[in-house]
Amino acid sequence: MSQILQHDAALVLFSGGQDSATCLAWTLSRFARVETLGFDYGQRHAVELDCRDRLIDGLKQIHPDWANKLGDAHTLSIPTLATISDTALTRDVAIAMGADGLPNTFVPGRNLLFLTFAAALAYRRGIGGLVGGMCETDYSGYPDCRDATLKALTTALNLGMATDFELHTPLMWRDKAATWALAQDLGGDALVDLIREHSHTCYLGERGARHDWGYGCGECPACQLRAKGWREYREAGTAT
């Protein structure tokens, strides 16, 4: 090994969305040192990046002991991703389903690039854990969110950097209702309310329209998944 990594430390891919906010809480409950990394890649919903500070402040209030675990908050600018992509996340076009069965919100290579940049940063910081909110249970079919893809990439990164990163994807087999339930388990109603009010999911960057599950247009695939998960989470809570 060319670099000794601390496996009680983790770098969380933290966009400011529901999934990454839940993953950050999950990581803080398990690791001794936690840093975060967000990406500004020309996304239409860049407002998500503005949500991160509020979420971090809220997490510190909910669990004061987490404040001592939180380290640097990193942001990388990679506008080239928008330059080479022709998608509804990086262009002002209507969201639609493509002929390949994927929505045109799919940004080819996005998660592959994100994790590669994250690994390079973690290598320099001596961090052994990488944490991402990817999921193939309740998602839009993106191939770079799949468990097999991410395991293969982790193997390639470890071979290419001669090291031993561990990739953690705590939401991989959870649907959106289970993600809300995980937030409840980690921080009670306070964490659920924090994520509902201050995380951002909407692909169109809408923060003016308030719903019971949070803010968003209510129509894009991301909003629909979040709304469906919230409804099922609430119904399950009522049933019990």
Swiss-Prot record:
Which species expresses this protein natively? Rhodopseudomonas palustris (strain BisB18)
What catalytic activity does the UniProt entry give for this protein?
7-carboxy-7-deazaguanine + NH4(+) + ATP = 7-cyano-7-deazaguanine + ADP + phosphate + H2O + H(+)
Identify the SUPFAM superfamilies for this entry. Answer: Adenine nucleotide alpha hydrolases-like (SSF52402)
What EC identifiers does the entry list? Answer: 6.3.4.20
What's one GO MF term for it?
zinc ion binding
Q: Which UniProt keywords apply?
A: ATP-binding, Ligase, Metal-binding, Nucleotide-binding, Queuosine biosynthesis, Zinc
| UniProt pathway annotation | Purine metabolism; 7-cyano-7-deazaguanine biosynthesis
Protein's name according to its UniProt entry: 7-cyano-7-deazaguanine synthase
Taxonomic classification: Bacteria, Pseudomonadati, Pseudomonadota, Alphaproteobacteria, Hyphomicrobiales
Please give the NCBIfam families that the UniProt record associates with this protein: 7-cyano-7-deazaguanine synthase QueC (TIGR00364)
Q: Which family does it belong to?
A: Belongs to the QueC family.
Per UniProt, Zn(2+) binds at C202, C217, C220, C223
Q: Where does this protein hold ATP?
A: F14, S15, G16, G17, Q18, D19, S20, A21, T22, C23, L24
Q: What does this protein do?
A: Catalyzes the ATP-dependent conversion of 7-carboxy-7-deazaguanine (CDG) to 7-cyano-7-deazaguanine (preQ(0)).
Set out the biological process GO terms recorded for this chain's protein. Answer: queuosine biosynthetic process
Domain of life of the native organism: Bacteria
| Principal EC category | ligase
Cofactors named for this entry: Zn(2+)
Q: Which Pfam families match?
A: QueC (PF06508)
Q: Report the cofactor remark.
A: Binds 1 zinc ion per subunit.
